[in-house]
Amino acid sequence: MTGFVLDPYVLDVLLPDLVGHDRSPSAFIVYVYLAHAAGSRGRVQVSYAAMASDTGLSKTCVQRAVAHLRRRKLVVATKATRTSVPDYRVTRPWVGRLPG
């Protein structure tokens, strides 16, 4: 098993924002899942069904969470064709904007 380092911003700011303010704990779960799956590459190709199975969320819940993350510009999803599995790029918009 390899280690996974989570940016402190994710727990300190993003968690309360997505769960508390946006009332979307599933979006937080999916963000962390995608960040882990993307690893150092920063991108991962995964289906809604696989995300649902891996996170324990329903497929509909995962679809809503991904839509929420896309609106918040926390993930970028691209597809080669309409029916292909999306390629997700996990973004960290706070990097470079925070002092220190």
Explain the meaning of each model-derived region.
Residues 1-53, 60-61, 83:
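Short recognition helix of helix-turn-helix/winged-helix DNA-binding domains
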Residues 59, 63-100:
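Winged-helix/helix-turn-helix nucleic-acid-interaction surface
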